UniProtKB/Swiss-Prot annotation:
Belongs to the neurotoxin 10 (Hwtx-1) family. 55 (ProTx-III) subfamily. InterPro entries: Huwentoxin-1. The presence of a 'disulfide through disulfide knot' structurally defines this protein as a knottin. It is found in: Secreted. The modification Isoleucine amide is found at residue 33. Keywords: Amidation, Disulfide bond, Ion channel impairing toxin, Knottin, Neurotoxin, Secreted, Toxin, Voltage-gated sodium channel impairing toxin. GO terms for cellular component: extracellular region. Disulfide bonds join 2-17, 9-22, 16-29. Inhibits voltage-gated sodium channels without significantly altering the voltage dependence of activation or inactivation. Preferentially inhibits human Nav1.7/SCN9A (IC(50)=2.1 nM) > human Nav1.6/SCN8A > human Nav1.2/SCN2A > human Nav1.1/SCN1A > human Nav1.3/SCN3A channels. Exhibits analgesic properties by reversing spontaneous pain induced in mice by intraplantar injection with OD1 (AC P84646), a scorpion toxin that potentiates human Nav1.7/SCN9A. One of its GO terms (molecular function) is sodium channel regulator activity. Expressed by the venom gland. This is Mu-theraphotoxin-Tp1a. Pfam families: Toxin_12.
Length: 33
């Protein structure tokens, strides 16, 4: 299962959904541009 937009995440183990990226400075899934 992947982490959805706005969900807390770990930038060293990015499990955000496709099209999202874990931001290393705020630790939540944001849009990957």
């Amino acid at each position: 299962d992947c982490l959805k937009f706005g969900w807390k995440c770990n930038p060293r183990n990015d499990k955000c959904c496709s099209g999202l990226k874990c931001g290393s400075n705020h630790n939540w899934c944001k849009l990957h541009i």
